[in-house]
A protein has these predicted regions:
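Alpha-helical transmembrane segments and their cytosolic membrane-interface
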Residues: 73-140, 230-239, 250
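Electropositive phosphate-/nucleotide-binding environments in soluble metabolic enzymes
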Residues: 7-11, 28, 74, 78-82, ...
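Core alpha-helical transmembrane segments of integral membrane proteins
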Residues: 113-186, 190
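Generic detector of multi-pass transmembrane helix bundles and their immediately adjacent loops
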Residues: 185-255
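C-terminal ends of transmembrane helices
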Residues: 104-107, 151-162, 210-223
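Soluble N-terminal domains of membrane-associated systems
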Residues: 1-96
Length: 255
């Protein structure tokens, strides 16, 4: 096989794995994808190391190459993971070439499955419905609808400008708590607790924590530990943001 073609195959498989890890995929799923794609082209002596922050791919042959990819940011996008799986299956079955697979992967990484406004609206309605579920009324529904969309939007803006997910969650939870209290003061919302809990739901790392537990179950202890600790730290950042807001308002005369 031509050396350039070999490099192209490895980079395509690595790219598929990168998109999956960035989108919150479990480690074992990303490793399985990269191994299947390479095995379909005759590369059977492959070693991989996948974690939430780095991917290492190497050929065990004496003159084999080694590839390393850093993952600076991650999110949760199950639709993107499914789309990569579809490309991987087509590639393994020989339905598409390496170049076609790479082009499809680039499209998957750059496109959004839904318009941003629709994602915000869906998030807001879901969080507002949860506020009703835990004891709120229609005024809490309206307040939570607004504050949860604000939380999602703030988190997206801050995470785009920062390399840490903790800052966005802290500032987001702090600001939406302030807005929720102000809404409560003007009569928009009768249950402040329901409004705040519903408002911070977009920030809660439920998928990340679940992925970490699944990594533990499949024996990927490093990835499982990293994901779970990250999820716990995000939860602490959210709680700290809400706590700071409540403490300050209480110090200023109470709620």
């Amino acid at each position: 096989m031509d050396v350039n073609e070999e490099v192209k195959i490895f980079r395509t498989a690595l790219y598929a794995c990168e998109i999956m890890v960035k989108s919150g995929s479990e480690t074992y799923r990303a490793e399985d994808t990269i191994k299947r794609m390479l095995a379909s082209k005759g590369f059977l002596n492959i070693s991989t190391f996948v974690s939430p922050t780095v991917i290492i791919l190497g050929d065990n042959l004496k003159d084999g190459n080694c590839y390393i990819k850093n993952i600076p940011k991650r999110s949760s996008n199950l639709a993107r993971i499914e789309n990569v799986n579809e490309v991987s299956r087509s590639y393994v079955q020989g339905k598409i070439s390496t170049d076609e697979a790479m082009e499809k992967l680039k499209i998957i990484e750059n496109e959004s499955p839904y318009p941003y406004w629709l994602m915000c609206l869906g998030c807001g309605i879901s969080c507002a419905a949860f506020a009703i579920l835990i004891g709120g009324n229609y005024t809490d529904f309206i307040a939570t609808l607004i504050t949860s969309i604000l939380a999602l939007h703030l988190n997206e803006i801050i995470n785009a400008a920062s390399n840490t997910v903790f800052l966005g969650n802290f500032i987001g939870s702090l600001i939406v708590s302030v807005v929720a209290i102000l809404f409560s003061k003007i009569g928009l919302g009768s249950s402040l607790e329901s409004t705040i809990v519903g408002s911070v739901l977009p920030l809660v790392p439920g998928v990340a924590f679940t992925g970490g537990v699944r990594d533990f179950i499949t024996g990927d202890l490093i990835s499982g530990t990293a994901r779970c600790i990250e999820a716990i730290m995000i939860g602490i950042a959210i709680a700290f943001g809400v706590g700071v807001c409540m403490t300050v308002f209480n110090a200023l005369g109470g709620l």
